[in-house]
Design a protein with these regions (language model features):
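Conserved N-terminal segment of class I S-adenosyl-L-methionine
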Residues: 1-98, 109-121, 135, 139-151, ...
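Hydrophobic adenine-recognition pocket in adenosine-nucleotide-binding enzymes
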Residues: 102
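Conserved beta-strand signature within the Rossmann-like core of class I S-adenosyl-L-methionine
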Residues: 122-132
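A short His-aromatic
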Residues: 105-106
């Protein structure tokens, strides 16, 4: 995991809070109220604090030892430092488990076992992970959404895509949530919630792996700029080569 510092968390604090306050009510409208939530890679706990605003009585977060306890937005006793690259040192069951833009920082060898951890923790998982080419500090395993869905589905969980369509066109929400945010639900969760089961039935499994236009356009502009610089450098190099060749000929006595 990268060593994120206080400045990193300060920079993302309010954008994360806004996203959480927009998305959490959507999640709860679908799955119903939750008493307990666990966040794997919780950072300073902003998402957990928003779940508490919406009635969660018990929240717990895990992240690396780099997290400054002074920045936590949950009680320090609700946070545990852990190496997320290893099987999680926790047990117990919660109403909801979540991990948002975290698993891309873990080695590919950890991909299967992190899903094992998540399904052991809750019947419903809120999940977001970087796709190939997304880029970011410390990303070592970017995979498509349907690859992660297959992992959950092998463990009996179904894939739900109810949130992305609701936030897709909202420019105030960070594009990585617009692009990557999915829910996974166990048979027990679906059996007790007809609305949840209906969303699972309606989810278009073939359209999970997508790239948001905001990042596509940004990457395209960047590549155009790089290509322009390349063209200019090639032109300058050709001009320098021509000057060098001319100078070499002028100093070559055999040319006189």
């Amino acid at each position: 995991m990268p060593n994120y510092d206080k400045q990193f968390y300060d920079d993302i604090r309010e954008t994360s809070r806004h996203a959480a306050r927009t998305i959490v009510p959507m999640v709860l409208e679908l799955i119903g109220p939750v008493a307990s939530v666990i966040d794997i890679g919780c950072g300073n706990g902003i998402w957990l604090s928003v779940f508490r605003e919406h009635g969660a009585e018990r929240t717990f977060g895990l992240d690396g030892g780099h997290v400054d306890r002074a920045t936590l937005e949950i009680a320090e006793g609700d946070f545990k430092a852990a190496d997320l690259g290893q099987p999680l040192p926790i047990a117990g069951r919660h109403d909801l488990a979540m991990t948002l833009e975290v698993v891309e920082h873990l080695p590919k060898a950890r991909a299967e076992s992190i899903v094992d951890d998540l399904v052991s923790l809750a019947p419903i998982v809120l999940f977001s992970a970087a796709v190939p080419g997304q880029g970011g500090e410390g990303h070592v395993n970017e995979e498509w959404q349907d690859t992660w869905a297959e992992r959950f589905e092998r463990r009996g969980y179904r894939t739900l895509d109810p949130i992305r369509p609701k936030i897709w066109h909202d420019p105030s929400i960070s594009w990585w949530y617009q692009q990557n945010l999915l829910l996974f639900a166990s048979p027990e969760a679906l059996a007790g919630n007809p609305d949840l089961a209906r969303v699972a039935d309606q989810t278009d499994r073939a359209r999970l792996s997508v790239v948001h236009p905001r990042i596509f356009v940004a990457r395209h502009k960047f590549l155009v700029q790089i290509n322009r610089k390349r063209i200019n450098l090639v032109k300058e190099l050709a001009e320098l080569q021509a000057k060098y060749d001319a100078l070499s000929r002028s100093n070559d006595p055999t040319e006189n």
